[in-house]
Amino acid sequence: MVQASSHAEGGHEGKQGAARSMGLLVAAVGVVYGDIGTSPLYTLKEVFTGGYGVQVNHDGVLGILSLILWSLLWVVSFKYVMFILRADNQGEGGTMALTALARRATAEYPKLRALMVGCGLVGASLFYGDSMITPAVSVLSAVEGMGLAFEGIDHWVVPISLVVLVALFLVQKHGTEKIGKLFGPIMVTWFVVLGALGVHGISQSPEVLKAFNPGWALNFFIVHPGMGVAILGAVVLALTGAEALYADMGHFGRKPIARAWFALVLPALVLNYFGQGAILLQNPEAARNPFYLLAPGWALLPLVGLATMATVIASQAVISGAFSLTRQAIQLGYVPRMQIQHTSSDEQGQIYIGAVNWTLMVGVVLLVIGFESSGALAAAYGVAVTGTMLMTTILVSAVMLLLWKWPPVLAVPLLVGFLLVDGLFFAANVPKIVQGGAFPVLAGIVLFVLMSTWKRGKQILVDRIDEGALPLPVFISSIRVQPPHRVEGTAVFLTARADAVPHALLHNMLHNQVLHSQVVLLTVVSEDRPRVPEHERFEVEAYGDGFFRVLLHFGFMDEPDVPAALKLCHLDDLDFSPMRTTYFLSRETVIASRLEGMSRWRGNLFAFLLKNANGNLRFFNLPLNRVIELGTQVEI
């Protein structure tokens, strides 16, 4: 009986584990694969109507299908799913997590480290451009299907798209926890429909299956040597969203993402692309919109509705990704501090950043109004996608060779293969800069300048403050000679350098002529890892005479809640009771000068960013009624 009960319990646990795995897989489909899953809406349409000169004939269709298939297999299946997903930073993925990993890998090589940081900032900058283009091109391509169902409705495509997109951005501050539970089932339905439509098309012209032979892709390059590389600029549209597999790894883990790709997403995409190819062989006129013309007439309107929902979900994924990337960048010191609002009491990762949301919304609206169609926007899309992919490969190269210590004889050929393919896709998109691709490039340049200026400015600011800093042992020795009046309580002084006296402490002594019975010099350290366990959160050192040095360590995915962290400091001599603890902050006002380190215009830009950044009070969750802020001017 006991044995039977044990088997029953084991079976129950097994069923629970299977149900959880299936739940993670469905959730991953809803969040991770929205972008790449909506690519069939516009990819083949752009290939054959985007001015590349590809003929809608037997060889042209099979050549393009083979290129798309083998691009999906090499870039997504092999490079991302089987390789890049293993380059996690304690389970987290994405540009900033990978940059932190590459910084650690190149710690002994300052110049190489600076190059890796630069690549990371470029990749992050292009991702923000992608976060504007994805909602615009996806929703436009879905709504354009209405033009096939109703004649004369084309002029309504832009207004309807704008209504959908603006509504999406307006609901962000309320969170998407409730409707987010529907994303997975809707996207699973979407991929099933993609596959079913593909099977329907293939059944009418099975010869498209010949495109599984990579010889058709090679033949296309041989027959069209000039067009071959250029057409990669359109083929890459089938790969948009591949970066999301890596960026969202922290939410679901590598295995559910990989299983969802091989079990559902990849088969559905391949079937649909081949189905579109089949109807193009039967009717070359279908090139104007092969996705929607693949569907029977009765299914057109329901398909437009489902496609619109799928594109909204894809847009939501990149918007959430932009919020997450921004939080990581803030923690790592690349972006000024902003107000971060949590939209879910259960899910820590569900956040809202107003400044990012409204900036993205303005960018998306301008893109829709300026480009008016998904075809026109496709040129801008490829530059952002391929640039981000290329930066990811460069960062992974450093991690593989210097952190994982892979033998060069194994690593170099693999990396050369990745870089060669990424380089070809990027080169194919460079000419598009004059056709609309300038937008993500300009957006990337602006964001790169902002992030690099902030990072450099903060370093110069710390150096300037440190120049005249009084060493802490000297200060303690001086107060032993002339002891000031001590008052009850704990004074916490936030400082970037724990071995020197912060300006706020000196100003307090100068003006008030008193010291608290306990003086804590607190330094918050941002780690190159996502989370720091509680037992590694703090370091405490007692200097005597009531002075303590405390270091708090936070990862780039941790909430830097200083009062909560200080409660973990278990020392008999330290008392962090809320009503006995006062926090002293320094508020620096920057004056741009001609001193070495930063040009005048960048100094002014940094001063503007610093003035408008969220201060330590909100960022560290300090109690408003227990904070005293003292100002100081610093030249940079």
UniProtKB/Swiss-Prot annotation:
It is a multi-pass membrane protein. It is found in: Cell inner membrane. It catalyses: K(+)(in) + H(+)(in) = K(+)(out) + H(+)(out). The chain crosses the membrane at residues 22-42, 64-84, 114-134, 150-170, 182-202, 220-240, 261-281, 293-313, 351-371, 383-403, 408-428, 433-453. GO terms for cellular component: plasma membrane. GO terms for molecular function: potassium ion transmembrane transporter activity; symporter activity. Keywords: Cell inner membrane, Cell membrane, Ion transport, Membrane, Potassium, Potassium transport, Symport, Transmembrane, Transmembrane helix, Transport. InterPro entries: K+_transporter, K_trans_C, K_trans_N, Kup. Belongs to the HAK/KUP transporter (TC 2.A.72) family. Transport of potassium into the cell. Likely operates as a K(+):H(+) symporter. This is Probable potassium transport system protein Kup. It comes from Pseudomonas entomophila (strain L48).
